[in-house]
């Protein structure tokens, strides 16, 4: 993630927000005007209205000088979806579990794509059918759950902000029939090499939401944050998500080159972190800490081929310093 931003606690929002390093920290003393950054306690990045996030970054509005061009070749294959472009902001209204095929799904640095859905449990499935990778460099916003499926690869840029109620990015494909039947099994596309998914940006989802990054190789160098939900980095050839609202995950790995790497920060406040692959490397931060007295998070690191390089910081405890579960398997 771009290092001109860092996480600070907002007393007004009661959450961590990404802010410019040129700004000062929020007030945590009893004296007015005394400000300092939070350094000792991890708090979640709660799902906020996009305006709050933009204001915290010093972006009161999005420039309208660039015509939105990152989305091309929209074809609705299930359900309904309508698209409206206003300058560099693209708004899509979709029905529950709508499926949209795209020739190109990119979000440029000055662009914003917003999915307006029927409820927080609604989902939209976006699939890229060309041979182009997806590059998300701008803002992706939704009140529901967003799936992005591109077997060619997905890169989330250092200035990107993803702010949804649930987010799944996968370089493994899923058939329309499986989506309609709510059988969320993603697997390698025939005659295609396993592609990589990389996150350099900021991904936040709503309370109890989930973030799933799925591919042949998965790498996080940015910040991922959920509140009571789950974060999964899954590298393999076949992944099944049993329930997209309250996800539990099964997976199979048949190739030793599948690798999951975390060099960034992953926060699951009282939730679950799953990193599963043939090979795992962690040099960043994995935190499932909870401010609740009774609830602790869980962290599972599962290296199917038995190779796990575990460094960085790993923490799962509640307010009473009682630990959650940390499981490392090979």
Mark where each language-model region is.
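Extracellular and secretory-pathway beta-repeat/beta-biased strand scaffolds
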Residues: 2-4, 15, 24, 28-51, ...
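Active-site and channel-lining beta-strand-loop segments
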Residues: 6-9
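IQ-motif-like calmodulin-binding regions
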Residues: 12
């Amino acid at each position: 993630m771009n290092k001109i931003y860092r996480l600070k606690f907002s007393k007004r929002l009661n959450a961590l927000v990404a802010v410019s390093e040129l700004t000062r920290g929020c007030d945590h003393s009893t004296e007015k005007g005394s400000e300092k950054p939070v350094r000792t306690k991890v708090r979640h990045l709660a799902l906020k209205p996009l305006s709050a996030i933009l204001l915290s970054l010093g972006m009161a509005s999005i420039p309208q000088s660039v015509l939105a061009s990152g989305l091309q070749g929209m074809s609705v294959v299930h359900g309904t979806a309508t698209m409206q472009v206003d300058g560099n902001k693209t708004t899509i209204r979709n029905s529950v579990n709508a499926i949209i095929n795209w020739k190109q799904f990119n979000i440029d640095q000055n662009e914003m794509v917003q999915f307006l859905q029927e409820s927080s449990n609604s989902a939209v499935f976006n699939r890229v059918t060309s041979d182009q990778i997806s590059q998300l460099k701008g803002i992706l916003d939704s009140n529901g759950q967003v799936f992005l499926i591109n077997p060619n690869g997905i890169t989330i840029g250092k200035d990107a902000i993803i702010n949804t109620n649930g987010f799944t990015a996968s370089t493994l494909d899923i058939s329309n029939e499986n989506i309609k039947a709510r059988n969320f099994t993603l697997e390698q596309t025939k005659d295609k090499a396993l592609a990589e998914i990389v996150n350099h940006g900021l991904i936040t989802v709503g309370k109890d939401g989930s973030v799933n990054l799925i591919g042949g190789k998965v790498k996080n160098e940015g910040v991922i944050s959920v509140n009571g939900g789950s974060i999964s980095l899954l590298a393999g050839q076949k992944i099944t998500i049993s329930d997209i609202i309250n996800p539990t995950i099964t997976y199979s790995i048949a190739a030793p080159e599948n690798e999951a790497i975390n060099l960034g920060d992953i926060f699951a406040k009282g939730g679950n972190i799953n990193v599963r692959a043939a090979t795992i490397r962690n040099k960043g931060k994995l935190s499932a800490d909870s401010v609740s007295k009774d609830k602790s998070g869980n962290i599972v690191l599962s290296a199917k081929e038995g190779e796990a390089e575990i460094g960085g910081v790993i923490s799962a405890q509640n307010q009473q310093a009682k630990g959650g579960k940390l499981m490392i398997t090979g």
